[in-house]
Amino acid sequence: MYGAYEFCNLCIENEIKPLIGLNCVWESASDKVELTIMATSYAGYQRLIELSTIISTNNNIVTTNDVKKYLNQTREVLVIIHANNKNIRYIKNNYDILNSTGHELVYFGLVPSDMDNITLLKSITSNIIPIDLVLYLDEKQHRIYQILQAIKEQKTLKSEDLSKSNEFLYKTKQDLMQHYPNEIIENIEKVIWLCNLKFPKNKPNSAELSLPKFTCPNNLTSNLYLQELCKQGLEAHFQSREIPETYVKRVLYELQVINEMGFADYFLIVNDYVKFAKIKNIMVGPGRGSVAGSLVAYVLGITGVDPIAYNLIFERFLNPERISLPDIDIDFEDTRRDEVIKYIHQKYGKEHVAYIVTFQTIASKMAIRDLGRVFQVNIEDINEMTKLIPIQYNFEIDMAIKQSPKLAWYANKYPLLFTLTKEILGFPRQTSTHAAGIVITSAPLVTAIPLQLGFQGIYQTQFPMQTLEALGLIKMDILGLRNLTILQNILQQVSKHYFLNLKLSQIPLNDEKSFSIIKNGDTTGIFQLESSGMRQILIKMKVDSLEDIIASSSLFRPGPQEYIQDYINRKLGKQKVTYIHEDLKPYLASTYGIIIYQEQILLILQKVAGYSLGKADLIRRAISKKILQLWKNKQTHLLKVLLIEVIHQELLRKYEKILKNLLVMDLIDLMLLLIH
């Protein structure tokens, strides 16, 4: 049922009535019978989810006991027995077994080649419908089906094997009338009338899909317990020193937002498994992404970066003006990540925890390899062709051909191969597991989500992440990072050979010897600093502070990249530091007057337009997609209009100079900052 939810929504958007069902093999006492079971209501859809989980964990097979138990428990599904020449001898017996459950919606399904059984079936019931298999809407697409089947089954083909066919084509009522009597065709309309699946207007099963309530000590509520942990964290951080008012106010503000949005349990759950990892001496990363802007996450020990010290903004993580799910990505040693997931699995239970499915889609390189094998193309040519496709054109084979004369030569040599590559690009090829994400729910997942067996006995969702988010599930990102494993091994070796119980937190962030290595570009193997381009920047910049490292990694990406030399010159005193307006100096002084970070964009919008930080982040998010589209279409003048539209007109006059300067600098680069 991988695409069931998305399919339903697309049908409804296009005013088509969705019919949702699944096929399974019923292993009866006499033979194996194929069944199609369809939902007649939302409750029936929920029962389909449960059945899908049963059959997905049992090789797509259900027993007689499974079928009888299932039909006894639900009346809101319709069952179709596939009646064919293989099982016709036992067809009445199988019908009687299903009918004995008292289920009224039992049908026989027929394909044209089995119409000689119609008389026997009519003697049992009048509930008979056509069940032609539909795989494509255009007979020209038959060859795509042939290709995908050959890839799946690892078969070979010749070009002459490819053909047009209407065998699995969508058939109109007139087409069906050529094969079936009217009374059978009319039963289709009856089935359509019986099936009335409608999803709730609100997110379905919101209570079931919510996070588990964290078990707090002393009968405290989640909100109060989180507040108590933050108080303890602040006191531990400042020890005997007085806690600055800015920290107290920031924590209280964040707690208010977290509690009002109902995410206290989320923080407690994340804090719990991070604490488990640290107790087990599993190295935990300092945090990545927008969660670094949360002081609550910092004082809990979830992250290791003080957001106040580094001017990070909480609203980029959790915006009180935008209902969105929090997203905390936590890195663990890659060799011990499974221990953390096992802990979560044991704590919350098998029925409540699952990995997330992903679908690997066919890109150009994969298509060339698959099609090359199917048509038995020389392996040396296949290898050469895939090397000639840049990663940025992996889904745009025509662009890759334009960029490479050698690839164009191969396209001329193998025209069918490249034509078919274009036709199968983007098709799902196989399922995989999300690299980091798991989901945890208060009620059993199977009440709302179809599951299948995943890694090490842990369930895997059949729905991908986008669908889970649409349903309201919160993803927990448990990442495995090789660099943390390397660091842990280094600490163990230091302890073993030098008898030092060294901790990374004890190493000063201004260590001169460390910066001597970095400024010389000796950073091979160091996360985010190891590419040749990055090493050149470190050398030219003469990096001597953590702020320089942060700036260099932020500059080394599309958009800000062209300001690298200006930044270096200003840092080294070779170029005067200027500001587009003196009012913005507090936000740009640390980066020598150059806009590098998203936080700076938000602060500028706050200053220039009078927005709250939450509103400023909304603006950034809302216009980013539009900006990207305009940028792709080279419509720079519209980009300027778009920027001006987000600024209050009454403030335009006061900050006219800022805006003019913003527009003088490469506006596309500025907008790319918003996107990134």
What are these regions (language model features)?
Residues 1-676:
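Alpha-helical scaffold/interaction cores of sigma-54-like transcription cofactors
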